[in-house]
Curated annotation (Swiss-Prot):
The protein's name: 3-hydroxydecanoyl-[acyl-carrier-protein] dehydratase
Cellular component, GO annotation: cytoplasm
Known pathway: Lipid metabolism; fatty acid biosynthesis
Transmembrane segments: none
Molecular functions per Gene Ontology: (3R)-hydroxyacyl-[acyl-carrier-protein] dehydratase activity; trans-2-decenoyl-acyl-carrier-protein isomerase activity
Catalytic activity: a (3R)-hydroxyacyl-[ACP] = a (2E)-enoyl-[ACP] + H2O; (3R)-hydroxydecanoyl-[ACP] = (2E)-decenoyl-[ACP] + H2O; (2E)-decenoyl-[ACP] = (3Z)-decenoyl-[ACP]
Species in which this protein is naturally found: Brucella canis (strain ATCC 23365 / NCTC 10854 / RM-666)
Length: 172
């Protein structure tokens, strides 16, 4: 497993996407264009809203990002599900960073609120994930609340984001 650091750059996140960070069969980020994170600015096993750990990350929005031309033609908006997926990506990364074994999968979320949009003129997305608990059993399960800011304005909130790590590779 890679050294446990408190921040990660883009090349390190790509290495995680190739399965090189946490070892074969363990937590892995998606590769571009589905990778919704450009850097992890802070990660800690303690602190956060529930004092169970947190992660902060950023994504640089570009006017030519792949989703703008198709969602929607003449009215470009980043699909909200991509921001939500970024929250799940970070939740899974945290579990791998803790050294937990298994392949990651998004399982569910509680409530999701969309209060704004990501447009081509948006410059920076900031993610915040605050962990409520990590349960270790047959499946390692991380539960967290998350938020997303666009150029400093809170636009998405999600409660009870759940990501599991399974040694078998599925949640079943």
């Amino acid at each position: 497993m890679a050294e446990q650091k408190s921040s990660y750059g883009y090349e390190e996140l790509l290495a995680c996407g190739r399965g090189e960070m946490f070892g074969p069969g363990n937590a892995q980020l998606p590769l571009p264009p589905m990778l919704m994170i450009h850097r992890i600015t802070e990660i800690s096993e303690t602190g956060g809203a529930f004092d169970k750990g947190y992660i902060r990350a950023e994504y640089d929005v570009r006017p030519d990002d792949w989703y703008f031309p198709c969602h929607f033609q003449g009215n470009p908006i980043m699909p909200g599900c991509l921001g939500l997926d970024g929250m799940w990506q970070l939740t899974g990364f945290f579990l791998g960073w803790l050294g937990e074994p298994g392949r990651g999968m998004a399982l569910s979320t509680g409530e999701v609120k969309f209060k704004g949009m990501v447009r081509p003129h948006t410059k920076l997305l900031e993610y915040g994930i605050d962990f409520k608990r990590v349960m270790r059993g047959r499946l390692v399960l991380g539960t967290a609340d998350g938020w997303l800011k666009a150029d400093g304005e809170l636009i998405y909130q999600a409660t009870d984001l759940r990501v599991g790590l399974s040694k078998e590779g599925s949640a079943q």
